[in-house]
């Protein structure tokens, strides 16, 4: 084979053609990677910019013209635009400390001075729904994954895996109506203390949604454990259950923890199920029978509303989204740290 024609069978006539094609593929891959980085950066910039506008929304602007700045003493006063004469009510200023530590969320009802923006009322609803969902998804997902990986016959596995994948492909709005029309009446049949909208029904539906995620990822982690570890356990006289729980699961703990944290992030960011089944009354509660509102539920309510883009109530959507972004990012970083720690331990 001539140096200028190393790969004639693949259609390349010269080294220059090979290098040109390789450079093109490399450039395309680099552009895709750069696009993902720029998209993430743009999301972060938009979130934090709009959240900053929320905390600076004590400034009243009319068609780009500065009108006045609100203070705690002047909140609720009426001012007029010097250009068009339009009337504006000065909003009560919201500090970051009041937002992040407040427990009352009431931005839609009452005067401007009565509006409350305590994000813990929304965080509590998100936490209780996520907790119920994880109580369903984590144990059932782990048990299902162990069964599929260690016990199930290949024919049974070939039937169960597509079923789980179908569950993962069902639209979340279907889960929301299922929670509202099936799970809630079932809960009320066993206990009449459940409201029509409640956190338990939403949490159960979100848990069913996350079950395929947990089981699939955990099974992949279990399948990645070397066969030699299992054979060593059997050689020592261990039973299948002992090998599964004392050898395989600890060896796959890195992937298992990553699956759990990914599922938690999924539950925290779930939108349609909680918007349909949990309710829209934000208040600080840990009673799973009560209606509640999550952070994503509030964002949906504001996105579908008729508030002005300069209104403090509308801008609160971005402040809540920033808190949600920080929570999910913290979970992702924690997942990477846990995965690296246990990976080093078992390698």
What are these regions (language model features)?
Residues 1-33, 335-347:
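Transmembrane alpha-helical segments of polytopic membrane transport and secretion proteins
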Residues 26, 140-179, 217, 345-347:
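Cytoplasmic-entry segments and transmembrane alpha-helices of multi-pass inner-membrane transporters
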Residues 165-210:
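Generic hydrophobic transmembrane alpha-helix motif, especially the helices
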Residues 12-23, 28, 48-133, 153, ...:
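Periplasmic/extracellular loop-to-transmembrane helix junction in inner-membrane transport proteins
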Residues 217-218, 225, 234, 240-278:
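Transmembrane alpha-helices
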Residues 189, 274-325:
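Interhelical loop and adjacent transmembrane-helix boundary motif
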Residues 41, 45, 139-144, 163, ...:
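Membrane-embedded alpha-helices of multi-pass transport/permease systems
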Residues 219-223, 227, 234, 261, ...:
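C-terminal transmembrane helix and the adjacent membrane-cytosol boundary/short C-terminal tail
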